[in-house]
């Protein structure tokens, strides 16, 4: 019986193979979508101009604020950049009341956020705050220079129109405040800040992936600025430095203001939607079922094969499939006719398997799979799985995780080739963040294997690529974008 189970696990695992020829097809299609996304709006790959036109080099100094609205918590932090690639960070996190998220008005939400900024300043920067108030109350007191510049990480779909201007396209993640849709979220926050008389200027609207790139560029060693930032975690996305003259759609976007002197701009790729039409992406029966049952069928197709939120769901569907085939004896406590999984196990709940389980399963090197047995009990309440059950699960997990890592190489290789970066530079620095790339065993190794298999990258190109973890794009990254934005504002005023 056990050999039938292991044979079936191997058969399913083979469906997740993603060979070199497929990687190459993916890269070719991604390059086509880059060109399309740079030339016009409403394309599969959004290629959003961020209006951030410079990356830091580690010498930047100053005290900046950053706030992060991306889910149920609102984070406020101050970042002191020391000018030597180091920084210190102070932060507080506040849970957003459900009624403010869903039944309030835009004014209610943004006033709530501004009040959190006020209490943070009073606790952590009271001297500065009080000095500002004193100066403002003096006759003709000009306190422009006392203002804190703030980077606003807003992790919802936004149409960005400038470095500190962007209109909300739609809410996600449980938020529903209809009167904010179509409004400039930076202006909404600034108005609430001004109503409270706070010494704060909303200097930049920040995407967390762009923040990842900026944070890496500030903290990474050496002369080379960071070229690309990528997130491989619950979701996946990338941002990279593009030549301004290639972003031809900028000419059609009205009212956009930005610094043209650097000749470059960071592009937010929004690569989760790469190849939504499935011309090149692998598409097993499990991918098809996951997509059909998701809340956005036909959308974010690349993300659904790569990011942590979905890998656990692919595994869950494979496990249920194997369990339904009684002849395999899978999870049947060593051949018993009853299943050894209680009804309340999250195995039976959509999205019930977290990626952390896959990381634990992949990492187990023990002969009897002891770590997997413990993990199955902890995560899924599965009692007494056999060693063969665990081996079958590990075989499938390995295939799902390896495919995700190899797919992750596609946008990296395509962007490197499309920009000619590998030909021009001896070193290309990439900052990455997210639970997969940080904790999934050998994720970067599998990704690099696939990069090497792209002929124009090869071993020589792979050696030029330096990948480093970049933490806290929504904190230090947002502060750095606020810094770039305030420099640009000063430059514009002096013209």
UniProtKB/Swiss-Prot annotation:
Alphabetic keyword roster: ATP-binding, Glycolysis, Kinase, Nucleotide-binding, Transferase
Q: Write out the GO cellular component annotations.
A: cytosol; mitochondrion
> Which InterPro entries does this UniProt record tie to the protein?
ATPase_NBD, Hexokinase, Hexokinase_BS, Hexokinase_C, Hexokinase_N
Q: Which reaction does it catalyse?
A: D-glucose + ATP = D-glucose 6-phosphate + ADP + H(+); a D-hexose + ATP = a D-hexose 6-phosphate + ADP + H(+); D-mannose + ATP = D-mannose 6-phosphate + ADP + H(+); D-glucosamine + ATP = D-glucosamine 6-phosphate + ADP + H(+)
Q: Does the keyword Nucleotide-binding apply?
A: yes
Q: Which Gene3D superfamilies match?
A: 3.30.420.40, 3.40.367.20
Coiled-coil stretches are none
Q: What is the relationship between pH and activity here?
A: Activity is relatively constant from pH 7.5 to 9.0. Below pH 7.5, activity decreases with pH.
**In this record, what's one Pfam family?**
Hexokinase_2
The UniProt annotation puts the region (Glucose-binding) at 149-175
Q: What protein family is recorded? A: Belongs to the hexokinase family.
**Protein's job:** The enzyme has great affinity for glucose. Mannose, 2-deoxyglucose and glucosamine can serve as substrates.
Subunit note: Monomer.
* PANTHER family per the UniProt record, alphabetical: GLUCOKINASE-1-RELATED, HEXOKINASE
What is the name of this protein? Answer: Glucokinase
* Organism lineage string: Eukaryota, Fungi, Dikarya, Ascomycota, Pezizomycotina
Gene of origin?
glkA
């Amino acid at each position: 019986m056990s050999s039938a189970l292991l044979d079936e696990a191997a058969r399913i695992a083979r469906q997740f193979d993603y060979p070199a020829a497929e990687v190459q097809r993916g890269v070719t299609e991604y390059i086509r979508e880059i060109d399309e996304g740079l030339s016009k709006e409403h394309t599969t790959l959004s290629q959003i101009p961020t209006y951030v036109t410079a990356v830091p080099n580690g010498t930047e100094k100053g005290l900046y604020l950053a706030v992060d609205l991306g889910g149920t918590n609102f984070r406020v932090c101050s970042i002191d950049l020391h000018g030597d690639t180091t920084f210190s960070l102070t932060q507080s996190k506040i849970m957003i009341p459900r009624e403010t998220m869903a039944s309030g008005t835009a004014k209610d939400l943004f006033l709530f956020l501004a009040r959190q900024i006020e209490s943070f300043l009073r606790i952590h920067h009271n001297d500065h705050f009080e000095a500002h108030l004193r100066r403002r109350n003096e006759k003709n007191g000009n306190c422009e220079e006392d203002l804190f510049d703030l980077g606003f990480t807003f992790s919802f779909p936004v149409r960005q129109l400038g470095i500190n201007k962007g209109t909300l396209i739609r809410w996600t993640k449980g938020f529903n405040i209809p009167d904010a849709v179509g409004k400039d979220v930076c202006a909404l926050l600034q108005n609430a800040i001004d109503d409270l008389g706070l010494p704060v200027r909303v200097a930049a609207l920040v995407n967390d992936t762009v923040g990842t790139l900026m944070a890496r560029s500030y903290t990474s060693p050496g002369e080379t600025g960071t070229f690309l930032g990528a997130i491989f975690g619950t979701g996946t996305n990338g941002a990279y430095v593009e030549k301004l003259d290639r972003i031809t759609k900028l000419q059609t976007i009205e009212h956009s203001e930005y610094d043209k002197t650097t000749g470059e701009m960071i592009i937010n790729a929004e690569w989760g939607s790469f190849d939504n039409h499935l011309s090149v992406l692998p598409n097993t029966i499990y991918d098809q079922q996951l997509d059909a049952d998701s809340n956005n069928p036909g959308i974010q197709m690349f993300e659904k094969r790569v990011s942590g939120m979905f890998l656990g769901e692919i595994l869950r569907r494979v496990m249920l499939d194997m369990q339904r085939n009684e002849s395999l004896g899978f999870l049947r406590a060593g051949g018993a006719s009853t299943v050894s999984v209680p009804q309340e196990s999250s195995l039976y709940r959509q999205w019930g398997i977290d990626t952390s389980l896959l990381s634990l399963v992949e990492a187990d090197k023990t002969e009897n799979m002891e770590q997997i047995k413990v993990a199955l009990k902890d995560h899924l309440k599965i009692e007494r799985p056999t060693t063969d059950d665990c081996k079958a699960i590990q075989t499938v997990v390995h295939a799902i995780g390896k495919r995700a890592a190899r797919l992750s190489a596609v946008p990296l290789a395509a962007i490197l080739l499309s920009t000619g970066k590998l030909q021009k530079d001896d070193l290309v620095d990439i900052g990455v963040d997210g639970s997969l790339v940080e904790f999934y065993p050998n994720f970067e190794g599998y990704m690099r294997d696939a990069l090497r298999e792209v002929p124009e990258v090869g071993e020589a190109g792979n050696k030029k690529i330096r990948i480093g973890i970049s933490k806290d794009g929504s904190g230090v990254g947002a502060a750095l974008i606020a810094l770039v934005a305030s420099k640009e504002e000063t430059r514009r005023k002096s013209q």
